[in-house]
Each structure stands twice: as C-alpha cells, then as structure tokens.
C-alpha cells in the first residue's frame, strides 16, 4: 500500500515540474488550478457565478478563480462562450486540448489505482 501511495505522490510531484507542455504546466502549477480544472471537468460548462458558488471561498477566492479562468482561456486550456440568452453571462469549459491533458493524466494513474484496489482485496 505504501508503494502505491509513493507512486501517486511521485507522479504528482513530477507533474508539477516544468514540462515542455504549457497546458500540463498550467494544470499542475498550483492546487487551485487543479481544483478548478477538476471542477470544470465534472461539468459540461459553468458560469463564473456557478463556479464561485460551488467552490468555497476558503478554498479558492473569487478573484483567484477569475485569474485562473483568464489565464487558462488565454493558453487555450479552457474555452469561454457567451450565453445566447444573456450576453453578460459567460460559460467556461475545458477545451479539447485541456480535456486531453486531464484524460492522459487520469489514464496514467489507472495502474496506481488498480493496484490500490487489488491490494485492498488481498488484505
């Protein structure tokens, strides 16, 4: 069990190290970026208000959320689209490239988590 957690820890630390891929760097540059990205990945799309309502301000402040969305949109990790019914509201979602980075990371963790499942059965 310790080895499995060590592998997950090592992968998270290595993911945070600078890579050639700016999208991967963005995802793991801070815990707030990672939390916001996983929140958006759990939704098809969300407005700033929805995000701020569902992520407590003690976890990520509104201004930090705005900055992460702005930076992520600039590097094409997120996409921003206008609400056709209310031009003031903007929807944010993962871009295809952002989604691919997240899926690749999750698939790389598949072995670790399947080992975790197997070790709990053996116990």
Show the residue positions of the predicted features:
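C-terminal regulatory/oligomerization modules of transcriptional regulators
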Residues: 1-6, 122-123
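Short alpha-helical segments that sit at the start of domains
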Residues: 8-37
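Amphipathic alpha-helical dimerization/coiled-coil segments
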Residues: 19, 103-123
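Short helix-capping/hinge SLiMs at alpha-helix to coil transitions
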Residues: 40-44
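Short acidic, hydrophobic short linear motifs in intrinsically disordered regions
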Residues: 45-55
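Short amphipathic alpha-helical interaction segments
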Residues: 59-74
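A short, conserved structural fragment
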Residues: 73-83
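Short, cationic-aromatic polyanion-contact patches
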Residues: 83-106
């Amino acid at each position: 069990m310790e080895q499995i957690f060590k592998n997950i820890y090592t992968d998270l630390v290595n993911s945070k190290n600078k890579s050639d891929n700016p999208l991967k760097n963005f995802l793991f540059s801070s815990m707030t970026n990672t939390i916001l990205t996983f929140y958006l990945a759990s939704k098809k799309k969300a407005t700033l208000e929805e995000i701020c309502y569902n992520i407590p301000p003690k976890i990520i402040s509104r201004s930090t959320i705005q900055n992460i969305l702005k930076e992520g949109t600039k590097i094409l990790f997120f996409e921003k689209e206008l609400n056709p019914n209310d031009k003031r509201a903007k929807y944010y979602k993962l871009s295809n490239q952002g989604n691919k980075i997240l899926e690749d990371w999750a698939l790389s963790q598949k072995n670790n988590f399947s080992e975790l499942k197997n070790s709990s059965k053996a116990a």
